[in-house]
Amino acid sequence: MAELDNHQKSLLRAYTTPGELIVKRLPQPSNLSTKLFAQGEADYCRKDGARFEQKAVMGNTLYTYWQTVEICGTPGKKIKNVKVLDHGGETSTPTWSYRGSASNPASYAVGAGWFVRTSENFEQSIVVDGIGAGQRTVCISATIRPSGEYNASERC
Protein backbone atom coordinates (compact mmCIF):
# COMPACT_ATOMS: atom_id res chain seq x y z
CA MET A 1 0.00 0.00 0.00
CA ALA A 2 1.36 3.41 -0.94
CA GLU A 3 2.20 5.77 1.89
CA LEU A 4 -0.65 8.12 2.81
CA ASP A 5 -0.20 11.87 2.99
CA ASN A 6 -1.45 13.78 6.07
CA HIS A 7 -4.79 14.70 4.47
CA GLN A 8 -5.48 11.07 3.51
CA LYS A 9 -4.55 9.91 7.03
CA SER A 10 -6.93 12.47 8.51
CA LEU A 11 -9.78 11.25 6.27
CA LEU A 12 -9.05 7.61 7.08
CA ARG A 13 -9.08 8.35 10.81
CA ALA A 14 -12.41 10.20 10.55
CA TYR A 15 -13.92 7.33 8.50
CA THR A 16 -12.78 4.49 10.79
CA THR A 17 -12.57 5.98 14.32
CA PRO A 18 -15.63 5.43 16.55
CA GLY A 19 -17.58 8.56 17.44
CA GLU A 20 -21.22 8.90 18.53
CA LEU A 21 -23.32 5.88 19.56
CA ILE A 22 -26.97 5.98 18.42
CA VAL A 23 -29.62 3.91 20.27
CA LYS A 24 -32.89 2.95 18.57
CA ARG A 25 -35.74 1.19 20.34
CA LEU A 26 -37.66 -1.56 18.61
CA PRO A 27 -41.02 -0.36 17.26
CA GLN A 28 -43.76 -0.97 19.81
CA PRO A 29 -47.14 -2.31 18.62
CA SER A 30 -50.21 -0.34 19.66
CA ASN A 31 -52.67 -3.24 19.66
CA LEU A 32 -55.05 -4.19 22.46
CA SER A 33 -52.85 -6.94 23.95
CA THR A 34 -49.99 -4.47 24.40
CA LYS A 35 -52.39 -2.03 26.09
CA LEU A 36 -53.55 -4.79 28.43
CA PHE A 37 -49.92 -5.60 29.23
CA ALA A 38 -49.15 -1.96 29.98
CA GLN A 39 -52.20 -1.68 32.24
CA GLY A 40 -51.30 -4.84 34.16
CA GLU A 41 -54.71 -6.41 33.56
CA ALA A 42 -53.47 -9.91 32.69
CA ASP A 43 -50.38 -12.03 32.31
CA TYR A 44 -48.92 -11.39 28.92
CA CYS A 45 -45.68 -11.67 26.95
CA ARG A 46 -44.32 -9.03 24.60
CA LYS A 47 -41.13 -8.30 22.66
CA ASP A 48 -38.87 -5.33 23.30
CA GLY A 49 -35.28 -4.44 22.57
CA ALA A 50 -32.80 -2.00 21.15
CA ARG A 51 -30.45 -1.54 18.20
CA PHE A 52 -27.20 0.38 18.63
CA GLU A 53 -25.38 2.07 15.73
CA GLN A 54 -21.73 2.95 16.26
CA LYS A 55 -21.01 5.99 14.11
CA ALA A 56 -17.56 7.10 12.99
CA VAL A 57 -16.23 10.60 13.57
CA MET A 58 -17.13 11.31 9.92
CA GLY A 59 -20.76 10.22 10.53
CA ASN A 60 -20.83 6.91 8.66
CA THR A 61 -22.01 3.79 10.50
CA LEU A 62 -19.11 1.53 11.50
CA TYR A 63 -21.25 -1.32 12.85
CA THR A 64 -24.60 -2.11 14.46
CA TYR A 65 -25.58 -4.52 17.21
CA TRP A 66 -28.92 -5.43 18.73
CA GLN A 67 -30.86 -7.27 21.41
CA THR A 68 -34.46 -8.51 21.30
CA VAL A 69 -36.08 -9.89 24.46
CA GLU A 70 -39.41 -11.37 25.46
CA ILE A 71 -40.86 -9.96 28.69
CA CYS A 72 -43.56 -12.02 30.43
CA GLY A 73 -45.60 -11.19 33.49
CA THR A 74 -48.10 -8.75 34.89
CA PRO A 75 -46.42 -5.33 34.84
CA GLY A 76 -46.92 -3.26 37.92
CA LYS A 77 -47.13 -6.53 39.82
CA LYS A 78 -44.45 -8.96 38.69
CA ILE A 79 -42.21 -9.77 35.74
CA LYS A 80 -42.11 -13.56 35.68
CA ASN A 81 -39.54 -14.16 32.97
CA VAL A 82 -37.31 -12.37 30.49
CA LYS A 83 -35.46 -14.24 27.77
CA VAL A 84 -33.20 -13.18 24.92
CA LEU A 85 -34.85 -14.01 21.59
CA ASP A 86 -32.19 -12.54 19.32
CA HIS A 87 -28.89 -10.68 19.52
CA GLY A 88 -26.03 -10.07 17.15
CA GLY A 89 -24.10 -7.57 15.12
CA GLU A 90 -23.10 -6.63 11.60
CA THR A 91 -20.84 -4.34 9.64
CA SER A 92 -20.17 -3.54 6.01
CA THR A 93 -17.52 -0.90 6.71
CA PRO A 94 -14.10 -1.61 5.15
CA THR A 95 -11.49 -2.62 7.78
CA TRP A 96 -14.18 -3.67 10.30
CA SER A 97 -15.51 -7.21 10.84
CA TYR A 98 -18.07 -8.82 13.15
CA ARG A 99 -16.52 -11.69 15.15
CA GLY A 100 -19.65 -13.05 16.85
CA SER A 101 -20.93 -13.15 20.40
CA ALA A 102 -18.43 -12.44 23.15
CA SER A 103 -20.35 -14.54 25.70
CA ASN A 104 -23.65 -16.30 26.24
CA PRO A 105 -26.63 -14.00 26.87
CA ALA A 106 -27.54 -13.58 30.54
CA SER A 107 -30.94 -12.78 32.04
CA TYR A 108 -31.88 -12.95 35.69
CA ALA A 109 -34.23 -11.46 38.27
CA VAL A 110 -32.92 -8.52 40.31
CA GLY A 111 -35.21 -7.46 43.13
CA ALA A 112 -38.64 -6.89 41.59
CA GLY A 113 -37.24 -6.45 38.06
CA TRP A 114 -34.90 -8.22 35.64
CA PHE A 115 -31.47 -7.66 34.09
CA VAL A 116 -30.37 -8.83 30.61
CA ARG A 117 -26.91 -8.58 28.99
CA THR A 118 -25.62 -9.55 25.56
CA SER A 119 -22.16 -8.84 24.14
CA GLU A 120 -20.66 -8.85 20.66
CA ASN A 121 -17.09 -8.73 19.26
CA PHE A 122 -15.97 -6.46 16.44
CA GLU A 123 -12.48 -6.05 15.04
CA GLN A 124 -10.75 -3.42 12.97
CA SER A 125 -8.17 -5.52 11.19
CA ILE A 126 -6.13 -2.95 9.29
CA VAL A 127 -3.69 -0.60 10.92
CA VAL A 128 -2.20 2.14 8.75
CA ASP A 129 0.26 4.54 10.34
CA GLY A 130 -1.16 3.78 13.78
CA ILE A 131 -4.79 4.03 12.61
CA GLY A 132 -6.90 1.11 13.83
CA ALA A 133 -8.86 0.19 16.92
CA GLY A 134 -8.09 -3.52 17.19
CA GLN A 135 -10.74 -5.68 18.83
CA ARG A 136 -13.75 -4.21 20.65
CA THR A 137 -16.32 -5.96 22.80
CA VAL A 138 -19.61 -4.07 22.93
CA CYS A 139 -22.58 -4.81 25.16
CA ILE A 140 -26.25 -4.12 25.60
CA SER A 141 -27.24 -4.20 29.26
CA ALA A 142 -30.94 -3.78 29.91
CA THR A 143 -33.05 -3.46 33.02
CA ILE A 144 -36.72 -4.34 33.03
CA ARG A 145 -38.72 -2.71 35.81
CA PRO A 146 -41.80 -4.28 37.42
CA SER A 147 -43.85 -1.88 35.26
CA GLY A 148 -42.50 -3.71 32.19
CA GLU A 149 -40.33 -0.74 31.13
CA TYR A 150 -37.22 -1.81 29.17
CA ASN A 151 -34.14 0.44 29.45
CA ALA A 152 -30.95 -0.37 27.51
CA SER A 153 -27.42 0.98 27.81
CA GLU A 154 -24.05 0.14 26.25
CA ARG A 155 -22.40 -0.68 29.58
CA CYS A 156 -20.52 -3.99 29.90
Task: Report residues per predicted region.
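N-terminal prepro-regions of secreted/extracellular proteins
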Residues: 1-55
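Mature secreted bioactive peptide module from preproproteins
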Residues: 36-156
